[in-house]
Each structure stands twice: as C-alpha cells, then as structure tokens.
C-alpha cells in the first residue's frame, strides 16, 4: 500500500495521551486526543505490535459541537500481551464513500502485561 500526504493541511486527529515512547502496563491504556471529522461516525482505535497483530481495539465518539468542528475524545482500551513489547496505537476515521482510512494518527509505546 501507498501512503499519500494530506493535501488540505495538517492531519485532523491528534493523540495527547499516551505520549510517544511511554511505558504502559496493566492491560489497559487511556487514550485521549482531539480533532475534527468529516462525518458523524465513531473513531476507530487499534493497538498493533511489530508483527501486525492487533493487541486491542475499540471505538470512541468525538465530543464536538458539530461535524467538522474541533472536539475531544477519551477512551480506555484493553489489550493483551504476555511480554513487554513495542506497539503502535492508531486512531482513525473511516468514511462511507471513500475506501480506506480518511484520517489517521498514531503513537509508538512500550506495552507490558
């Protein structure tokens, strides 16, 4: 697959917590961020290790006054791992009419059991 840079400015989603390279343990992680979306659908979240295995996933609604306006999100996602490993937490928006990801942001973290 190819990645195409945004042609309409900066990415519309960002993750405030956790930060890049944070160490997380206990089987769940609080993910907080902000952004604006193109349609009224939940954001998707996936925690993926280096092998491409999904360790945890979920959805969260963006709390915004209206579609296209700045809002925030906060969600606790559970994950499963038996050893400490590097993983990427991705938050993204899918669109009904456009195949694939419309907006995507991620952070790399160290996950422990």
Label the model's feature ranges.
Residues 1-3, 10-113:
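Ser/Thr-rich low-complexity repeats and stalk/linker segments
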């Amino acid at each position: 697959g190819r990645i195409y840079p945004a042609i309409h400015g900066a990415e519309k989603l960002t993750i405030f917590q956790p930060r890049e390279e944070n160490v997380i343990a206990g089987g769940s992680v609080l993910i907080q961020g902000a952004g604006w979306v193109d349609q009224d659908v939940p954001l998707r979240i996936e925690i993926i290790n280096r092998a491409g295995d999904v360790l945890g996933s979920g959805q969260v609604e963006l709390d915004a006054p209206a579609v296209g306006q700045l809002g925030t999100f906060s969600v606790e996602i559970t994950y499963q791992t038996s050893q400490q490993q590097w993983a990427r937490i991705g938050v993204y928006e899918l669109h009904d009419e456009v195949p694939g990801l419309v907006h995507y942001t991620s952070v790399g973290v160290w996950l422990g059991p």
